From Swiss-Prot:
Polar residues bias: start-end ranges: 110-119
GO cellular component: cytoplasm; plasma membrane
Locations listed in the record: Cytoplasm
Any one Pfam family match given in the protein's UniProt record, by short name: DnaA_N
Region: Domain IV, binds dsDNA, residue numbers: 352-472
GO biological process: DNA replication initiation; regulation of DNA replication
Source organism of this protein record: Rhodopseudomonas palustris (strain TIE-1)
MF GO annotations: ATP binding; ATP hydrolysis activity; DNA replication origin binding; lipid binding
Domain writeup: Domain I is involved in oligomerization and binding regulators, domain II is flexibile and of varying length in different bacteria, domain III forms the AAA+ region, while domain IV binds dsDNA.
Protein name: Chromosomal replication initiator protein DnaA
PANTHER family per the UniProt record, alphabetical: CHROMOSOMAL REPLICATION INITIATOR PROTEIN DNAA
Comp. bias (Basic and acidic residues): 99-109
Residues engaged in binding ATP: G176, G178, K179, T180
Its biological purpose: Plays an essential role in the initiation and regulation of chromosomal replication. ATP-DnaA binds to the origin of replication (oriC) to initiate formation of the DNA replication initiation complex once per cell cycle. Binds the DnaA box (a 9 base pair repeat at the origin) and separates the double-stranded (ds)DNA. Forms a right-handed helical filament on oriC DNA; dsDNA binds to the exterior of the filament while single-stranded (ss)DNA is stabiized in the filament's interior.
Chain's gene name: dnaA
Length: 472
């Protein structure tokens, strides 16, 4: 891809991100690549059929309009599925780019030597491809991911017959913070010996496998194969759809846990927030060890950048990024690890294709679209309940209870009001999180507090104080 096409593609992605929002973009478009632009058509690719189908069904017009804003003559956007190349084992001599997903785009200079490497992963059982770069050796540990890394390492080092400590192990975080890296590291390490069978599946792969088994009347064999696994690793659980598929996943989860087998799951939110999942599944997932991977701190971002430079030198020995440039990138690119990976890839491509050393001026120009304004803090209902309970000297269990004494009712109403105004949760979801109340109770509480804060200055000050505490 030429520099002009790269710039054009960056502008189109920027329009698309602005149009659909960061969450939607990260979920559906982050792994979409530009293959070519020819006359009036654009050729894009994604790594899975599921992504292709979803984007074509829900966003094809939006993608086309973003391209037409850049190139008015474009009248067609073709979307295809990239075919990964399989290989046998992780490349031990090459440290992986940390925090990157398995389908991360690589610079054109690297792609010329082959597609992103992936590995066979119990193909007979329909395992998802593995990236040999995503191992424990290449994972950079920092304060935000220490617990998740330690728990994953403990799971990976277990032996058949050992007591299972964390079951299921549930890891959640925003996109690009290293969940997939840890899950694939568990799979690589677990399969390094011959003692245990470890299977890595994305949620969409689980869905496709189960639906295909139903169509071919081989569902019994599918179930037996899954339940014969020692460690089942499921990624991107938020994409698990369909009542029948969710029921089968729940049965598999129960069967494995009851048999003392290990289950490891990752998603982009905690179990309680997976509103599309059956309550039984959420409850079982919440019963294990739930670990959040927090956003990357500056020190960890710097470590990731250094690791990526070391990895790039495996194929480009002369590649170097000066320390001031690394510090600039770590300070300004704060969103996730994929953006850090992309920044190093851009500098590598620009340096090699133009035969120029990396400078701070070059970096400022090449990564300008990766520097995003600070995003508001994501506030959780649990945080609201905790801070409101502390403010009014009641317990969180009081807020969730059926008690109707005055010293509990008002704090509960304030907490519901804050949940409605500071989060994107629906009224039924807020009610469920407050002891199973219905949406009319929440609506009454919201209207009650809205009416009071306009008249009662003491209450108004209390509510503003709570908002400040939650947003700090």
């Amino acid at each position: 891809m030429s520099n002009m096409e790269q710039d054009r593609w960056s502008r189109v992605k920027g329009r698309l991100r602005s149009s659909v929002g960061e969450d939607v973009y990260s979920s559906w478009f982050a792994r979409m690549d530009l293959e070519s632009v020819h006359d009036e058509s654009v050729h894009l690719s994604v790594p899975t059929r599921f992504l292709k189908s979803w984007i074509q069904t829900h966003y094809s017009d939006k993608v086309l309009s973003c391209w037409q804003a850049e190139l008015p003559e474009v009248n067609r956007v073709d979307l295809t599925v990239r075919s990964p190349v399989r290989c046998a084992a992780p490349a031990k001599e090459a440290p992986a780019p940390v925090e990157s997903r398995r389908d991360e785009q690589r610079p054109s200079a690297e792609r010329s030597n082959g597609a992103t490497p992936v590995s066979a992963n119990h193909d007979a059982l329909g395992g998802s491809p593995l990236d040999p770069r995503l191992t424990f050796a290449s994972f950079v540990v920092g304060r935000s991911n220490t617990l998740a890394h330690a728990a994953a390492k403990q799971v990976a080092e277990g032996r058949r017959g050992d007591p299972v400590m964390f079951n299921p192990l549930y890891i959640h975080s925003g996109v690009g913070l290293g969940k997939t890296h840890l899950l694939q590291a568990v799979t690589w390490a677990g399969n390094a010996g011959t003692e245990r069978k470890v299977l890595y599946l994305t949620a969409e792969k689980f869905m496709y496998g189960f639906v295909a088994a139903l169509k071919t009347q081989t569902s019994l064999a599918f179930k037996e194969a899954l339940r014969g696994i020692d460690v089942l690793v499921i990624d991107d659980l938020q994409f698990l759809q369909g009542k029948t598929t969710q029921a089968e996943f729940c049965h598999t989860l129960n069967a494995l846990i009851d048999a003392g087998r290990q289950v490891v799951v990752a998603a982009d939110r905690p179990p309680a927030d997976l509103e599309s999942l059956d309550e039984r599944v959420r409850s079982r997932l919440a019963g294990g060890l739930v670990v959040e991977m927090a956003p990357l701190g500056e020190d960890l971002r710097l470590g990731i950048l250094r690791s990526r430079v070391v990895a790039a030198r495996t194929h480009h020995a002369s590649f170097d990024v000066p320390q001031p440039v690394l510090e600039y990138l770590a300070r300004t690119i704060t969103h996730n690890g994929r953006d850090l990976e992309g920044a190093i890839n851009r500098l590598l491509a620009h340096s090699k294709l133009n035969n120029q050393p990396v400078t701070l001026e070059m970096a400022e120009h090449e990564v300008r679209d990766l520097i995003r304004p600070s995003e508001p803090k994501r506030i959780k209902i649990e945080d609201i309940q905790r801070i409101v309970a502390r403010q009014y000297n009641v317990s969180r269990s009081d807020l969730l209870s059926s008690r109707r004494t005055a010293n509990v009712v008002r704090p509960r109403q304030v907490a519901m009001y804050l949940a409605k105004t500071l989060t994107l949760r629906s009224l039924p979801e807020i009610g469920r999180r407050f002891g199973g109340r219905d949406h009319t109770t929440v609506l009454h509480a919201v209207r009650k507090i809205e009416g009071l804060v306009s008249k009662d200055t003491t209450l108004s000050d209390e509510v503003e104080s709570l908002k400040r505490q939650l947003q700090e």
